[in-house]
Amino acid sequence: MAELGLNEHHQNEYINYMRFARSKRGLRLKTVDSCFQDLKESRLVEETFTIDEVSEVLNGLQAVVHSEVESELINTAYTNVLLLRQLLAQAEKWYLKLQTDISELENRELLEQVAEFEKAEITSSNKKPILDITKPKLAPLNEGGTAELLNKEILRLQEENEKLKSRLKTIEIQATSALDEKSKLEKALQDLQLDQGNQKDFIKAQDLSNLENTVAALKSEFQKTLNDKTENQKSLEENLATAKHDLLRVQEQLHMAEKELEKKFQQTAAYRNMKEILTKKNDQIKDLRKRLAQYEPED
């Protein structure tokens, strides 16, 4: 429908709703006609009427017609609200915020275009049938599948980002535990050496020799343990660096996806919404980088 700027699928949706509205309008007009017909058959049986009788008949007819018209207007408004709710609900599933221009609802030019299209749709003898199929949920901005693929890629990157956060947290816990263990071993060695110095004047030479041998053995064992802990710490630091590189890669991919979306969504109402989502994700990544910097080894 070139005159209203809709594609074939949305044209079919529009025609279905237009037919529904026309059917409801026809039923209500028949109801109004029946009000007049009932009046003719039930009240207009006399040849002459007084002014009071005519006023009474017209007042009764006015009340009935007023009630019917009011009911139809209310029902039409509620129907439009339900239709709008469907569109908004589908948009929210794609993290979009739709905007409406109420002033366009009174645009005479557009209203005339709608009327002309309805007239052409009614009178056209070669119009294509509208297939009644099960309709999938709307996929906004799905031009050639590019935007949908970008959205899927963003979701994948978000999942990978969460996995990296979890992995980073585990590495941080392991690194903290290793540092604590190393500190405990160093303190135990210092305490043992201090205790050895305090007891040298109170033991015999033989006992001192044995104690020194024992201390040497313990020191060697402690040193070996410390070396193992140091190697473990280096491994944890390497894992931490790897996690940081992975995080930077994810950030770069998110940045590339953002640029691609900007090219795709520019000049659309959804551009600002997707930009806001990517900005939040970048802020989360910046916060994560700050947290990573706190656990990087100092020179």
Curated annotation (Swiss-Prot):
Which Pfam families does the record associate with it?
Leu_zip
What stretch or stretches form a coiled coil here?
88-296
Recite the UniProt keywords alphabetically: Coiled coil, Cytoplasm
**A GO cellular component entry from the record:** cytoplasm
Q: List locations, semicolon-separated.
A: Cytoplasm
Keyword Coiled coil annotated: yes
Q: Which family does it belong to?
A: Belongs to the LZTFL1 family.
Q: What task does this protein carry out?
A: Regulates ciliary localization of the BBSome complex. Together with the BBSome complex, controls SMO ciliary trafficking and contributes to the sonic hedgehog (SHH) pathway regulation. May play a role in neurite outgrowth. May have tumor suppressor function.
Q: Self-association or partners: how does it assemble?
A: Self-associates. Interacts with BBS9; the interaction mediates the association of LZTL1 with the BBsome complex and regulates BBSome ciliary trafficking.
Name used for this protein in its record:
Leucine zipper transcription factor-like protein 1
Which organism's genome codes for this protein? Macaca fascicularis
The organism's taxonomic lineage, starting at the top: Eukaryota, Metazoa, Chordata, Craniata, Vertebrata
